[in-house]
């Protein structure tokens, strides 16, 4: 007979009698003979006390000595744009399902682990990454973990904090020399915590005060970018667990996120705390080896694989790579833009400098070798494969499998290269609908977010202190292949610098569109910046000559492209203003928000000034309607 597992929770007061005999806490003819280890019960109760009744659910299997423990991780602390970029539902918990031996618990076999979101059926790549992380964590813990060991650890912990125990003697010894410092690094144990029984709120505070250093998330109701339109958006605000909270928003310290939480409240609470520590910083670690990424400008928004060859092979064979078919179906215009940027960088005379990262693509005919290898760059072969990537317009008009077959016939490396272009993008890009910034005069407008949670948190802290404004950043399209993967970096006095740095080192911005349009057109041998009058004439000419192509064209139809970004910048004393040329030496104080693309020498209105109240109002309108819905 096939016995199906039954879920149990405190609300299950009714139901048919046949299923009740399998439920946790109910004695039945089959379940009566099964022994449930008391440490398992204690750990389950600890989860309920520290989190909530709904944070854990249990499923027993009748006569089988197995039990599934579902731990519900609340991820509402993630910002809206982060959860969207990571393809997770921030309104729904991530479920960690661990299968233990019912009678042996920690003395039994190592538990199997599943990670899922019930409503997130496809493309849950974050779940695969988290499953791998928690699997490694459990394997390490299981080497020394047992029911007796856990009980001993808890007894030691409790005796340490008894009024007659070690902590009292330790404090007395300290008082001979000096008073206990009132420092965040040494939380003070109040006498009230050492005497009598605490109330529930105080007890929970006491628990948190006694933890090892680790990361956890709170969920204050704060808007995504500090703008008022959305009451649902949450602020990522990591803190050291058990220590007095630091400034209003402290930056994430990713090194702490691999610290092992205490076993004081059992293994289930420990693994939940570890998952909470790791989730906000998944983008900072390789999805395969779990080693921290090393980037010139820090981590980026989306999780990715590192450049180690073993990781690249595993990434390919595990199928974690973003499916090109899905991306073309859901964001064809974005894929079109990514391919255009890759082509511009590859065809640049400066490709040896700016075409970074170079693709790491596994050979489909020999999965043990790399067809494209950063250590052995072959730009000609790469160009041939890129030329064989069919237009995204064609891909949307027929069967994707048939189009893939056609590409494979043209060049077997074309489709793997397309997959790499999509999966290596570490920024969140969304094509804006009709409610876009009309004064930019282009249909190719994108929401562009590249800052990881830690940088966005630091940005918000600085914004509360100093305020912010908007300014344009102009850079030739050949540079954006790298910017989307490495971030907007301070290129002054480096090999990446294309223009002069007359006003010092930093990221160059301008409130005036004509200045940024000038920078965006420079590249591919063009090193003279057009004057504002020339840009105005070009803009007027492009908008009076009858257009052969519709302004509402969905896809890019030209390889002659100009682009500029609209950034939000902190208005602190670090921002150096030299007339209409601004220099920000602090990369954490600049975050990209929007991206605009123009074809065939087209430019937008050269007279736009982001400090104009009407322009600012329009920017705020689009942010309010786009950031929160995308």
Swiss-Prot record:
Auto-mono-ADP-ribosylated. It comes from the Eukaryota. One of its GO terms (biological process) is protein auto-ADP-ribosylation. One of its GO terms (cellular component) is nuclear envelope. The modification ADP-ribosylcysteine is found at residue 237. GO terms for molecular function: kinase binding; NAD+ poly-ADP-ribosyltransferase activity; NAD+-protein-aspartate ADP-ribosyltransferase activity; NAD+-protein-cysteine ADP-ribosyltransferase activity; nucleotidyltransferase activity; protein serine/threonine kinase activator activity. It catalyses: L-aspartyl-[protein] + NAD(+) = 4-O-(ADP-D-ribosyl)-L-aspartyl-[protein] + nicotinamide; L-cysteinyl-[protein] + NAD(+) = S-(ADP-D-ribosyl)-L-cysteinyl-[protein] + nicotinamide + H(+). The modification ADP-ribosyl aspartic acid is found at residue 600. Residues 394-620 form the PARP catalytic domain. Keywords: ADP-ribosylation, Glycosyltransferase, NAD, Nucleotidyltransferase, Transferase. Its EC number is 2.4.2.-. Gene3D superfamilies: 3.90.228.10. PANTHER family: POLY ADP-RIBOSE POLYMERASE FAMILY, MEMBER PARP. Belongs to the ARTD/PARP family. Mono-ADP-ribosyltransferase that mediates mono-ADP-ribosylation of target proteins. This is Protein mono-ADP-ribosyltransferase PARP6. The lineage of its organism: Eukaryota, Metazoa, Chordata, Craniata, Vertebrata.
